[in-house]
């Protein structure tokens, strides 16, 4: 994030009255740098219109809002009304006047109704949940102008997140998440096959890279624990014992108390896709 946005984030983390929002902003800082670098490579600049697909409660809204500036605009979309409510709280707290957050399904959105087409679309932790990523990428491409960009940050199943010292709960949680996704109809290897899916969707793969992030245990363990807590109901519906989920969750939260040098995110596939000009 630039100094202006980062400063507002830090002030809210230190002094904000909404504990949950403070937590979300702390978590967002872990991935802000990777998003900023990807947007920079795509040439995001003042005046651009950008959309964060599946933005959740914060996504990359703050980074995009800063990059496109007052002359640009950012739209965040999520299917969850609760996530949209939280994202609006983030935008208000950070005074992101160029940002709008709406509830909707990416597959059914009308670009014109959102003020599109957009110069750039972004997904993180979104395509990993899609049973038909080709269809999802086509839907996202409809939101983008010819020649526009789609930046994709999606985590691979292997390797799982790591820590030092090693924590078995990280392996258990990451494997559990992917077992649930497969039972929900997401094909194994969905993220690994995204470059092929992009080409099948009619997109050009401008670059394919990858990254993981090492962070402070308190923040990164919180990312993993909150992810597990969010999918616990679905895991239980898929036949995983609630106590099994709770045991892993307890281990992840205990890691926040100390004893670890570092914790990593999963390894993210970093794709820069481009919609053909004709």
What are these regions (language model features)?
Residues 134-149:
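A short glycine-rich, Lys/Arg-flanked "PGG" loop and its adjoining helix->strand segment in the class I
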Residues 119-133:
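A short SAM/SAH-binding and catalytic strip from SAM-dependent methyltransferases
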Residues 29-49, 63:
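Conserved alpha-helix/loop element of class I SAM-dependent methyltransferases that forms part
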Residues 111-120:
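A short acidic, Gly/Pro-enriched loop at the edge of an enzyme's catalytic core
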Residues 10-31:
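Class I SAM-dependent methyltransferase Rossmann-like catalytic core
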Residues 189, 204-278:
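Conserved Class I S-adenosyl-L-methionine
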Residues 51-111:
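Class I SAM-dependent methyltransferase SAM/SAH-binding core
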Residues 151-219, 234:
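Conserved catalytic/acceptor-binding region of the Class I
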């Amino acid at each position: 994030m630039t100094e202006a946005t980062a400063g507002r984030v830090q002030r809210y983390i230190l002094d904000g009255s909404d504990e949950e929002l403070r937590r979300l902003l702390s978590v967002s800082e872990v991935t802000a740098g990777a998003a900023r670098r990807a947007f920079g490579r795509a040439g995001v600049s003042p005046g651009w219109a950008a959309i964060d697909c599946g933005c959740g409660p914060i996504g990359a809204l703050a980074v995009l809002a800063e990059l496109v500036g007052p002359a640009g605009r950012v739209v965040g979309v999520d299917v969850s009304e609760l996530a949209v409510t939280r994202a609006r709280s983030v935008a208000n707290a950070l005074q992101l006047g160029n940002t709008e957050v709406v509830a909707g399904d990416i597959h059914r959105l009308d670009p014109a109704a959102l003020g599109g087409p957009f110069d750039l679309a972004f997904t993180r932790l979104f395509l990993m949940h899609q049973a038909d990523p080709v269809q999802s990428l086509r839907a996202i491409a409809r939101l983008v102008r010819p020649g526009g960009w789609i930046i994709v940050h999606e985590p691979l199943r292997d390797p799982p997140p790591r820590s030092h010292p090693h924590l078995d709960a990280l392996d258990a949680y990451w494997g559990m998440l992917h077992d649930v996704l497969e039972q929900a109809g997401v094909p194994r290897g969905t993220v690994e096959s995204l470059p092929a899916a992009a080409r099948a969707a009619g997109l050009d793969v401008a670059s394919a890279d990858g990254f993981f992030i090492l962070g402070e245990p308190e923040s990164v363990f919180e990312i993993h624990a909150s992810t597990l807590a969010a999918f616990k109901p679905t895991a239980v519906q898929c036949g995983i014992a609630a106590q099994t989920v709770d045991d892993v969750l307890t281990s992840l939260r205990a890691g926040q108390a100390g004893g670890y040098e570092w914790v990593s995110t999963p390894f993210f596939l970093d794709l820069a896709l481009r919609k053909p000009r004709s």
